């Protein structure tokens, strides 16, 4: 390449920082902003000599899931769940269910973020919010079940958690790809 790379665009090892296509990119000196700037979807994951996906370590998985759990959520309700998939047969089936996208089957690990009202309902039932005695005891109306607006909020919360997971994966040197 004939483009000049300034010192600010060098990695810690002195090598030029390049984008997905090999072109030099500018860096800000801020690790989070640089991760966000340089992140792109990965559809070809690292393979070992036997053409198996390179495993994501337990420590990497824990860090990514912890980052996802730190995402803000409406009312701190976290009305979503994260399904972790490492079994090849399940990855194969997921690839088929998601419009036959083979990169899912070739990934070492997949996370599914789903709206999950069960947590809300279980909590309300546990503390008696649906019982007539609740009104008597607290002077408040009985709590309602989740509605359509709550579904939208829960879906947004799930996507915020997913974005935290993506940024954490990128920070750990792992690629990711959202599947709709």
Say what each PLM segment does:
Residues 1-180:
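Acidic, surface-exposed loops and disordered segments
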């Amino acid at each position: 390449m004939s483009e000049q790379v300034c010192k600010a665009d060098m990695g810690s090892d002195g090598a030029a920082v390049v984008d997905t296509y090999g072109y030099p990119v500018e860096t800000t000196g801020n690790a989070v902003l640089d991760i966000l700037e340089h992140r792109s979807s990965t559809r070809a994951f690292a393979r070992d000599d036997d053409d198996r996906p390179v495993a994501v370590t337990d420590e990497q998985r824990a860090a990514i899931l912890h980052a996802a759990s730190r995402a803000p959520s409406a009312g701190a309700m976290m009305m979503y769940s994260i399904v972790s998939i490492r079994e090849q047969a399940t990855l194969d089936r997921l690839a088929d269910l998601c419009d036959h996208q083979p990169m899912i089957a070739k990934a070492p690990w997949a996370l599914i973020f789903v709206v999950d009202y069960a947590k809300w309902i279980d909590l309300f039932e546990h503390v008696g919010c649906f019982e007539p005695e609740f009104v008597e005891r607290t002077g408040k109306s009985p709590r309602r079940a989740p509605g359509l607006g709550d579904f939208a909020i829960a879906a947004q919360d799930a996507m915020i958690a997913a974005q935290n997971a993506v940024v954490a994966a990128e920070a750990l040197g792992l690629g990711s790809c959202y599947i709709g």
